[in-house]
């Protein structure tokens, strides 16, 4: 990620804390997929798979989003089960991990190849979906740049409203 993106994400993390930060990043990722041209996106602020994204050319991703400031994440059994359910509908299960670090970017990993538990982030590299990462990386930076200031003021409410305006289905409690 660009240095400016890192600085903005750090500001969001400092203001809102790790749990809310994770939800904000999930919404930024949904915006990123919308910018990438995915036509059918569902973003869930409730239990279950975090994001479904389907493209015009038939690609379908069910995405479990994890954010951290450490070198590992917890990939729970419930995450695996939720992704498996979406796989039955033709979605490719993806584990998306963002470590808030100066030189980090999203890692998109083929989740069906990963066992639940505490996972060292670097261990996910062998499972990466490099094309998906490359196609979304610059758009994530752009999404942060476009929506940072309003998100600092209004957090999830602003991002939810923006996503709905763009035709994304937002599911909340």
Where is each model-derived feature located?
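Acidic-basic catalytic patches of nuclease active cores, encompassing PD-(D/E)XK
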Residues: 1-43
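Catalytic cores of nucleic-acid endonucleases
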Residues: 8-16, 20, 42, 60, ...
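Non-catalytic C-terminal interaction segments of nucleic acid-processing enzymes
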Residues: 32-35, 112-173
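Conserved catalytic cores of phosphodiester-cleaving nucleases, focusing on short active-site segments
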Residues: 33, 51-53, 57-69
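Alpha-helix C-cap/termination motif
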Residues: 36, 54, 86-90
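Beta-rich catalytic cores
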Residues: 47
